[in-house]
C-alpha cells in the first residue's frame, strides 16, 4: 500500500472549498492501492493528523476531534531523511508517508509555499512544482509570462495597498476605461473579485480586494469563452490531457465558484466544449 498524505484545509479564504475537494479526493482514491493519511491544517496554520470519521472532513467538524499535532522536518539525504512527525503522548514519532497530495486552495497551498516545504523535507508530492505554483497563483506574473510568450490576454495593471488616488485612476485608463475587473492578485475561486462599472463601484472593489491581498490586479473587461482542461503528467513520463470543458456564464458575468450554496447557479457546464 502507498501511504498518501492528503493535505486539506489551510489558512486561505478558500479553506472550506479545500474541505470539499479533499472529500472528493478521499472518495476517489483506490483503497486497494492507497492508504490515506489525513493532514488537516486549521485556519491558523497548525497541522494535525486526523484519524476520525471521514464525513467530518467536509463539514469542518474534524477540528473538534483530538488530533495529534504534525510537523515537517527538513532533510532529504539517505542518512538524514526528513518528513512528517506527529506528537503523541509528549513524544514525536515518524508518520509514515510515501507521497503527499496537497488538496489546498489559495495562499499557503497553491502558491508554492507548501510545495517548497515538501521539497526541503524530501517528501515527494503530486501537482505543480514551486515555480509553476507561484507563477499561476500570482495574476500579475502569469499575465507577464503569457504576454512574453505571445499569448493574447486582457490588459492587466497592478496596484499595491496604499496607492494614491491618481495611481488608482491611471490603471483604469490603461485598461481602456470602465468596466474593469478588480481582483486580489494572489487569490482564487473568485473570492474578492468584483466587476466595477463606475468610480463608486471601483472604490468598493478595491477595498474588497485589498482586504485580502496587499497586491491587486485591475483587468480589462473582455467578452470571451471560459474553458478548462485537466493535464496530468510531466516532460519525463509524458502528458495526458482530458476533454476541454466550457463554462457558459449567465447573470453577473463571471464564474463565482466560491458561492457556498450553489456555486453553479449562474453557469452552464458543457463537456466537451462546443468550441469551433
Predicted stretch roles:
Residues 1-2, 32:
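Basic/polar N-terminal segments that are highly enriched at the extreme N-terminus
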Residues 14-15, 19-23, 31, 37-158:
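Conserved N-proximal alpha/beta basic substrate-recognition cap immediately N-terminal to
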Amino acid at each position: 500500500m502507498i501511504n498518501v498524505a492528503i493535505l486539506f484545509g489551510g489558512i486561505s479564504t478558500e479553506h472550506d472549498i479545500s474541505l470539499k475537494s479533499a472529500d472528493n479526493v478521499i472518495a476517489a482514491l483506490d483503497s486497494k492501492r492507497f492508504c490515506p493519511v489525513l493532514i488537516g491544517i486549521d485556519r491558523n496554520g497548525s497541522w494535525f493528523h486526523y484519524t476520525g470519521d471521514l464525513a467530518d472532513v467536509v463539514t469542518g467538524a474534524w477540528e473538534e476531534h483530538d488530533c495529534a499535532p504534525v510537523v515537517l522536518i527538513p532533510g532529504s539525504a539517505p542518512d538524514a531523511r526528513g518528513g512528517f512527525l506527529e506528537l503523541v503522548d509528549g513524544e514525536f514519532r515518524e508518520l509514515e508517508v510515501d507521497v503527499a497530495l496537497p488538496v489546498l486552495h489559495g495562499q499557503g497551498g497553491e502558491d508554492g509555499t507548501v510545495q517548497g516545504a515538501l521539497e526541503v523535507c524530501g517528501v515527494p508530492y503530486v501537482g505543480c512544482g514551486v515555480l509553476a505554483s507561484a507563477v499561476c497563483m500570482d495574476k500579475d506574473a502569469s499575465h507577464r509570462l503569457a504576454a512574453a510568450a505571445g499569448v493574447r490576454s486582457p490588459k492587466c495593471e497592478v496596484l499595491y495597498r496604499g496607492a494614491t488616488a491618481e495611481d488608482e485612476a491611471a490603471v483604469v485608463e490603461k485598461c481602456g476605461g470602465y468596466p474593469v475587473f478588480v481582483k486580489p492578485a494572489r487569490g482564487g475561486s473568485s473570492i474578492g473579485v468584483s466587476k466595477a462599472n463606475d468610480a463608486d463601484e471601483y472604490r468598493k472593489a478595491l477595498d474588497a480586494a485589498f482586504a485580502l491581498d496587499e497586491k491587486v490586479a485591475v483587468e480589462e473587461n473582455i467578452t470571451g469563452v471560459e474553458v478548462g482542461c485537466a493535464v496530468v503528467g510531466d516532460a519525463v513520463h509524458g502528458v495526458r490531457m482530458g476533454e476541454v470543458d466550457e463554462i457558459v456564464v449567465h447573470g453577473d458575468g463571471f464564474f463565482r465558484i466560491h458561492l457556498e450554496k450553489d456555486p453553479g447557479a449562474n453557469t452552464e457546464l458543457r463537456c466537451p466544449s462546443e468550441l469551433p
